[in-house]
Amino acid sequence: MELDVLGLFGACSYALDCVEAELVHVTTFHAKRVAYMSVCTAEQFGVSGEALQDLAVCALLHDNALTQYLHEEFRGDSSAAECLPELPHLGAHCVMGEENISALPFHTDVEHIILYHHENADGSGPFGKTWQEIPLGARIIRLCDLLDAFCRADIFTPDVWERANAFLTRVRGRIVDE
């Protein structure tokens, strides 16, 4: 029997969308957008083949432990999800997420991609890592995660790309690469 790994991870992403819908009563398809943007960005850096496939999977599953974290942090009180942007220790879901994917059958080394996907270029992220200490995959997912949050559909306006470009210019060197 042959395992369709991409199909499996697509199904996992769908399951995460369902959990998101249950928690915050809306499905945003955030993981799918981040995965798509991550693949497009990684290709510009010359990433291809199995490494690109593994990055796509990591991007799909980058927030795989977010609901687990919320459940543990708030003892199952899903109404706490409303305060998500203000959670002080959101990096904990990165640790849980890294553990969750550790036994998955990746083709390449994906260690620390999930763990460091909220790190900032200047070391101000949850683990204090600077850009040179963070795998390229995690840096790409960080950038695409920020862009998706910035350009999400509920705040979409015709000038969204100009605002996104201005945002990236403001945070260059602090949050993302120069």
What are these regions (language model features)?
Residues 2-178:
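Histidine- and acidic-residue-rich, metal-dependent catalytic cores
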